[in-house]
Design a protein with these regions (language model features):
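Histidine-acidic metal/acid-base catalytic patches
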Residues: 1-5, 10-28, 80-87, 145-166, ...
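Active-site mouth loops of central-metabolism enzymes
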Residues: 3-16, 63-72, 101-107
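Active-site-proximal loop/turn and secondary-structure-junction residues that shape catalytic pockets
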Residues: 10-12, 36-40, 64-67, 94-98, ...
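N-terminal substrate-binding region of glycoside hydrolase catalytic domains
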Residues: 21-42, 62-67
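Glycine-rich, proline-tolerant flexible connector loops at the mouths of alpha/beta enzymes
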Residues: 33-53, 98, 102-103, 138-139
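Alpha-helix-loop-beta-strand connector modules within alpha/beta enzyme cores
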Residues: 47-64, 112-124, 149-158, 217-224
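Active-site acidic/histidine proton-transfer and metal-coordination neighborhood
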Residues: 68-163, 173-174, 248-251
């Protein structure tokens, strides 16, 4: 059976990290994706203790960034905390344009240079970095890396210790998606696969993601792409949604598990 991971963001509004861990382990889910700001709310000592008592492991650690000149000093502390939680990979949040910045090519070069510096630190600490391209409509304010093609090229230029995560919400539209997933797979760079859905209409680009099966994304088709490219990792549920956040977290996780088991089956 396909391994299912829940990203804490899916239920974070009504379940703190300790509650989230308990809800997952009660449902037989032993791997989670976590957030540094949620760790801070409950305390790192307690979070680590509960995680270890439950025998759980961490897939993704969210996150380092935004990658601005004044934030790079904080990056190493986040990487070190991710290492203490033994996260499989750490997400890079590039951020968008800086004040008075309008040249996209220059902004992207700035971010690429910053990623190189972060990678140097990550290698020393012993954690992997993950680039997750975000939808082009959030390029200006959230992420200057908008395509899997760009992410792959950055990884190729920088070498070991960095890979990509495919989030269907951000990549489903890309006509090069199959080719770029294959490219990442051939290089052993596919670190994660995130699922949710794109609703019609979408009321908010950040906080109106759908539960799998409620929207228009060809989820089975994209899952087949990552599997064919050699990805054997988990299916990770990451849903930013004011609708789902308002519901009982246990119910949300139960529905997510049921949808994943229906849609995604290991080949």
């Amino acid at each position: 059976m396909t391994n299912i991971v829940i990203n804490h963001a899916t239920v974070r509004e009504r379940a703190d990290m300790l509650t989230f861990l308990r809800l997952c382990v009660e449902r037989g889910l032993k791997t989670v994706s976590i957030w540094g700001d949620e760790i801070a709310k409950v305390g790192e000592t307690d979070a680590l203790s509960v995680l270890r008592d439950f025998g759980m492991t961490v897939s993704g650690y969210n996150r380092v960034g935004p990658l601005t000149a004044d934030s790079l000093d904080r990056v190493e502390a986040e990487l070190e905390r991710a290492a203490r939680f033994e996260a499989d990979h750490v997400f890079l949040f590039t951020g968008g344009f800086q004040a008075n910045e309008k040249d996209l090519a220059t902004a992207r070069r700035r971010v690429e240079d910053s990623i190189g510096k972060v990678l140097d630190s990550a290698r020393k600490i012993g954690v992997k970095l993950a680039i997750e391209p975000l939808h082009p409509m959030v390029t200006g304010d959230r992420a200057l890396i908008s395509s899997l093609s760009h992410a792959n090229s950055i990884c190729e230029a920088l070498g070991p210790g960095i890979g990509v995560v495919v989030d269907v919400y951000h990549c489903w539209w890309d006509e090069r998606l199959a080719a770029e997933i294959e490219r990442a797979g051939e290089a052993g760079r596919l670190l994660g696969f995130h699922v949710n859905d794109w609703l019609l209409p979408t009321r908010h680009l950040l906080t109106d993601r759908g539960m799998m099966g409620d929207g228009i994304i060809d989820l089975r088709g994209i899952y087949s792409m990552v599997r064919s490219a050699g990805y054997k990792g988990a299916v990770e549920v990451e849903i930013f949604s004011t609708d789902w956040w308002s519901r009982d977290p246990a119910e949300v996780i139960d529905i997510a598990i049921d949808r994943c088991r229906s849609l995604f089956r290991a080949e």
